[in-house]
């Protein structure tokens, strides 16, 4: 229907870290009736083709002539299937589908917006959402345990106490020694500096998870820093 106009503010690329931290895919939706006739009993729907988990649906009792409705609340209900990202090793392009129907199920307006799903190890929007890097601090990976055991051995040699008791000792110097032991354990891994893992994206980067990092023994600056955080 040519009298309907939709404006969407959304993320053109979606990553697992964004999903896990409840960053909404769609931030704002404007629906305008540019015609001279009011529309009643409408249903607005947003979904992601092939990889959507929960669509966004909204009942609209009345959309007046030349009226614009502004949607921001509950848009976070639109989400992807997380397994769709966990199974990806490369970017997958799909579409965000918007549909507006009347009470009879007749489609009054339909529009497609391009969107992409990125691999789970991809860090997006480092410049605008740097806090998302914290999602890659994964202290429960099994690959962490051998590094901590080595650090504990070093800590015991230095202090006769190999326990990682954090601030329970109430001794700032002990905390420093714990961090030094962790750092020394990572140094012993003899990591080779390696540039960013291969990717075709224009922004963001892949981040090697700790199992890959300590197996391949290659890492860049962000990966080494995230490893220190994982072990802290």
Model-derived features with residue positions:
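Low-complexity, acidic Ser/Thr/Pro/Gly-rich terminal tails and inter-domain linkers that flank the onset
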Residues: 1-24, 49-52
């Amino acid at each position: 229907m040519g009298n309907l106009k939709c404006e969407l503010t959304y993320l053109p690329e979606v990553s697992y870290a964004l999903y896990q931290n409840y960053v909404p895919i769609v931030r704002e939706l404007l629906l305008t009736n540019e015609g001279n006739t009011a529309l009643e009993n409408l249903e607005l729907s947003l979904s992601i083709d092939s990889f959507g988990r929960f669509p966004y649906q909204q009942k609209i009792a009345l959309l007046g002539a030349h009226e614009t409705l502004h949607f921001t609340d509950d848009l976070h209900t639109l989400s992807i299937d997380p397994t769709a990202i966990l199974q990806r090793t490369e970017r997958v392009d799909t579409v965000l589908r918007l549909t507006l129907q009347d009470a009879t199920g007749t489609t009054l307006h339909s529009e497609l917006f391009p969107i992409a799903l990125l691999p789970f190890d991809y860090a997006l929007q480092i410049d605008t959402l740097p806090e998302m890097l914290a999602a890659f601090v994964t202290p429960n990976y099994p690959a962490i345990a051998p590094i901590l055991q080595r650090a504990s051995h070093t800590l015991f040699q230095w202090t006769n106490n190999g326990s990682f008791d954090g601030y329970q000792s109430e001794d700032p110097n002990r905390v420093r020694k714990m961090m030094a032991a962790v750092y020394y354990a990572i140094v012993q891994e003899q990591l080779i500096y390696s540039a960013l893992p291969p990717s075709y994206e224009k922004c963001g980067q892949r981040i090697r998870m700790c199992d890959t990092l300590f197996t391949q023994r290659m890492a860049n600056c962000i990966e080494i820093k995230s490893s220190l955080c994982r072990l802290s």
